[in-house]
């Protein structure tokens, strides 16, 4: 057992660097706990506000005996041109702050270097979010391997890799609306340029940031991926080959949350009472509820959110609708009240204004569908719970995830969104799916057609495979063992 080796021979010490955004931090905290369960000493480096988000979950883990510690560093906000006190991606109020935020999180090299000089035992490996490219310099200085974590699936990572190697495909496109086929892919898949991460032209400072990220990717020792072999075997195999064997699929990492409190508080404390939420779900028929959540950084204009709400109402199906970033959606709150929407749907619609206990909700027997923005965390949680997906991608890797879910795995239905909704440009795009389109998509997903039944059957089977993957002897469990053995050999050869 690797856990025995780490205790008896050379104590492994992994230092984890999560990017300061909710969707990036959540799986990284899960990874910390998974590795600590194998006897690896874990140090998480983050800022005070981000540490506070996960205080309850990590405190329970530490109290249970897991060797996890958190080191807090001050983000140089003002030096990078940010307002004082901004430490999280979600707290950015405008597009203009994105570049300063990226610069700020990558100005931590000097304080982190000092931390490494004082750490004991000496770190044997870095696991870093791909956005924090400065960690490559730390790894090089201290002669330790750096493992990248992208937070994406193998399908998306392979797509990005193939297009980097065949850049003429993107260069020859006449417009951002022109479709192209990804070459050398196990399945025929078409995209437009904006639908692929880092494929569009980036002006000014953004291009420099991208180049730093790509260079850090090239110099990394390997990659861990929050997916499982059985979900996307062809893509996992091809991506591992592209990374010269140094790619380990270790997910779904969310399944390390076995205690009810950990599930309820994964990512943040829920803004609804857990018992109230479960009581509402208990009152609904099995498989009847549509869970609706467009992510922690929902960039959807008010006009579109109104159409979504009216479509949910006209579907006549029970639903839970999570509206996050609530302080940014005051106009929607007013519409809920003034239009009578909240009153009309009160008997079959539960509105959660803020953070929801998503894992608990998806695991409930009354939930039969998940309308999602296709962020990889949410996509994987839905599949792991055996829930078919209604896809509504917005940005970055989410269109890749939609293609995987709808075209390759055939466990989802597209709501019809094909245009990227860039932050700050929501109102320009306006309504992409009207209320009739929403109603039609909900019926297609939740109905009793042969296709709907087949989707439910397929996603249930994939959910069962997810649970087997993380059990002892499963593919993801074995890959964690393989990763630790690899790093152990490196650590011993360096000492």
Curated annotation (Swiss-Prot):
Its EC number is 2.4.1.-. One of its GO terms (biological process) is saponin metabolic process. GO terms for molecular function: UDP-glucosyltransferase activity. It comes from the Eukaryota. Pfam families: UDPGT. The active site is at 24 (proton acceptor), 129 (charge relay). It is an enzyme of class 2 (transferase). InterPro entries: UDP_glucos_trans, UDP_glycos_trans_CS. Keywords: Glycosyltransferase, Transferase. UDP-alpha-D-glucose binds at residues 23-26, 355-358, 373-381, 397-398. Transmembrane segments: none annotated. Belongs to the UDP-glycosyltransferase family. Possesses very weak glucosyltransferase activity toward 2,4,5-trichlorophenol (TCP), when assayed with high concentrations of TCP. PANTHER family: GLYCOSYLTRANSFERASE, UDP-GLYCOSYLTRANSFERASE 73C5-RELATED. This is UDP-glycosyltransferase 73C9. It comes from Barbarea vulgaris.
């Amino acid at each position: 057992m690797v856990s025995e080796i780490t205790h008896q021979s050379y104590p492994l010490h992994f230092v984890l660097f999560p990017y300061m955004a909710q969707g990036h931090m959540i799986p990284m905290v899960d990874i910390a706990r998974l590795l600590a369960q194998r006897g690896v000493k874990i140090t998480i480096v983050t800022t005070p506000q981000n540490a506070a988000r996960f205080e309850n979950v990590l405190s329970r883990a530490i109290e249970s005996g897991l060797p996890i510690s958190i080191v807090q560093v001050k983000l140089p906000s003002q030096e990078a041109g940010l307002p004082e006190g901004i430490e999280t991606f979600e707290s950015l109020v405008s597009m203009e702050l994105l570049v300063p935020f990226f610069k700020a999180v990558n100005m931590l090299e000097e304080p982190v270097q000092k931390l490494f000089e004082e750490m004991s035992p000496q770190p044997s490996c870095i696991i870093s979010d791909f956005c924090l490219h400065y960690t490559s310099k730390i790894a090089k200085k201290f002669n330790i391997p750096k493992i990248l974590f992208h937070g994406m699936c193998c399908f998306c990572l392979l797509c990005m890799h193939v297009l980097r190697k065949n850049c003429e495909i993107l260069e020859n496109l006449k417009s951002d609306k022109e479709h192209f086929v990804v070459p050398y892919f196990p399945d025929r898949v078409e995209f437009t340029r904006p639908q692929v991460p880092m494929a569009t032209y980036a002006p000014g400072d953004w291009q420099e940031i991208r180049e730093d990220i790509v260079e850090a990717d090239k110099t990394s020792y390997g990659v861990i991926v929050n997916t499982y072999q059985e979900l996307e075997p062809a893509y996992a195999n091809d991506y591992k080959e592209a990374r010269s064997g140094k790619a380990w699929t270790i997910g779904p990492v969310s399944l390390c949350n076995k205690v009810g409190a950990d599930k309820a508080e994964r990512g943040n404390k829920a803004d609804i009472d857990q018992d109230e939420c479960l009581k509402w779900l208990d009152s609904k028929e099995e498989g009847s509820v549509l869970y609706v959540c467009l992510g922690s950084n929902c960039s959807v204009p008010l006009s579109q959110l109104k159409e979504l709400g009216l479509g949910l109402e006209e579907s006549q199906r029970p639903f839970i609708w999570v509206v996050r970033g609530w302080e940014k959606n005051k106009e929607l709150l007013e519409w809920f009240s003034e239009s009578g929407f909240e009153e009309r749907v009160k008997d079959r619609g539960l509105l959660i204004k803020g953070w929801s206990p998503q894992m608990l909700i998806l695991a409930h027997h009354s939930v039969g569908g998940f309308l999602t923005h296709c962020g990889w965390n949410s996509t994987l949680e839905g599949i792991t719970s055996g829930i078919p997906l209604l896809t509504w991608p917005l940005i970055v890797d989410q269109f890749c995830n939609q293609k995987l879910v709808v075209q390759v795995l055939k466990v989802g239905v597209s709501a019809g969104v094909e245009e990227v909704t860039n932050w700050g440009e929501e109102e320009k795009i306006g309504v992409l799916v009207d209320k009739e389109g929403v109603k039609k998509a909900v019926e297609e997903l939740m109905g009793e057609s042969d296709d709907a039944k087949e989707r439910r059957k397929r996603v249930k089977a994939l959910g069962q495979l997810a649970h087997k993957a993380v059990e002892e002897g499963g593919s993801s469990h074995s890959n964690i063992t393989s990763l630790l053995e690899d790093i152990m050999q490196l650590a011993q050869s360096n000492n």
